[in-house]
Amino acid sequence: MESLQNHFLIAMPSLDDTFFERSVIYLCEHDDKGAMGIVINKPLGIEVSSLLEQMDLPAEQVFADIAQNAQVLMGGPVSQDRGFVLHTSQPYWANSTDLGSGLMLTTSRDVLTAIGGKRSPDKFLVALGYAGWGKHQLEQELAENSWLTIPATNALLFDVKHEDRWPQASRSLGFDAWQVSAQAGHA
């Protein structure tokens, strides 16, 4: 099995799941035990600055402006009460996992305090919940043509507007995902 860690999953138009419809998921982990990822294009309608306020983590003014423009994302249907911060590597927070390619996933409160202050990661996404797959489940969904995959890029992850991530990710494959058949074939 080839790991798809540090890849994007792009939902096929035929994916019959209202939660994952037109989703782009960054895969944080993928091994023979399963997979874990964060949906990167489904904003919840909450600014990061509001989340910081709700957690009694006041943001300094300059950094409050950055946090106000950032949206909290619906990271997936699993553990929606848990926060996940996907960010560029800076090694001084608790509960951080190095994902490679200059990215980290942090689940501790201290990274949110940093986002409100002077130690904020250069680029970050804040999500509630994650997407998870059991052993061989993702491989089965890939075989069923539910997802397309591409290597992850920081540009798509951090610089493209949420609503543009799915069409841009599908176009990066060289075609429009709407033109792909939902049926798998064998020659």
Swiss-Prot record:
- Tell me the superkingdom of the source: Bacteria
Q: Which Gene3D superfamilies match?
A: VC0467-like, VC0467-like domains
Xref: Pfam families: DUF179
Q: List the disulfide bonds.
A: none
Q: Which GO terms describe its cellular component?
A: cytosol
Task: Output the HAMAP family linked to this UniProt entry.
Answer: UPF0301
What the entry lists under NCBIfam families is as follows:
PRK00228.1-1
Which family would the database say this protein is a member of? Answer: Belongs to the UPF0301 (AlgH) family.
In Swiss-Prot or TrEMBL terms, this protein is called: UPF0301 protein Sputw3181_1330
Native source species: Shewanella sp. (strain W3-18-1)
